[in-house]
């Protein structure tokens, strides 16, 4: 992987190795993708102050996330269908995160189940939860996460209604899926992916297996999921989840100051400033645009995490400078996974680690705690 020097390099390999439908599922956004682009562009528009003649020989990226030590201020975000990018992808990604000394978040919509991942890693991981109409099943998922010793619950709060993603529809990533000659030919042109994913033992929504009587087929489960996102979800439901989840609770998908104020009243330990990677409300502001005001409003009440548009270590530095305590990455590590499996995730994390370290040095800071808006040219 010597020729791989940035996340975009991993993205290009990912694009070549994985069928278009699954690559686009990870890479694209909703509607016109304005918010997806804004996440990236608004971060890159933020400029740094270059500082000179400062001793930066002892740079240290370590920090704490929710009171636990972390080797750097990164978290692998929950990504649905990770195991369709690379066979047993969730296990590979979790192992890479734990080797790097950072948290991994397993999606409700994963291919590998909570139990699959727990049986194949050495340390606790986080679990992401979608609240569905079937509250009994949600309680069961929480109980399974507790049994697996998951150390935090990430509750996604911005998916009561699913944003329309044009690329998914055009690629037949619908429920039920649409098959075409072009899709079959695309699959046939990716023999390594077919051998790993389609011939692997895990090819359905692992956390949902057994819930529908009589079938574990991914199409049937997908059809059920499409009917389960709950438009009645409200703050009282958060109270209920808080009452049955004994560990750290994180609310993911907050973009508005008023919502952040309500989030701070729930007893959650943290929130994630996020627009679901530009996959939900197209036309919403970028995550970095709203981060400072949310930090100002509730940063003294709960830990603020950032998600959306991170493609480099410089982007991590920008988010930290504007008040985030840590950053979630999704596409950045999924590109590594789709390109090279577990070693690709290792590579993505190595790239981000090195870029963050170099940027800290050029801005004259040695520790994560030193990073604030003084490193920015604003």
What spans do the regions from the language model cover?
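Short, conserved beta-strand segments within well-ordered enzyme catalytic domains
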Residues: 47, 62-64, 73-77, 103-107, ...
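Active-site-adjacent beta-strand anchor residues
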Residues: 29, 107, 128, 155, ...
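Glycine-rich active-site/cofactor-binding loop and its immediate structural neighborhood
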Residues: 70-109
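Alpha/beta enzyme core
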Residues: 81, 95, 120, 133-306, ...
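A gly/proline- and charged-residue-enriched helix-loop-helix capping module
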Residues: 99-120, 124-138
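An N-cap/entry alpha-helix motif that binds or orients negatively charged groups
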Residues: 1-67, 172-233, 369-371
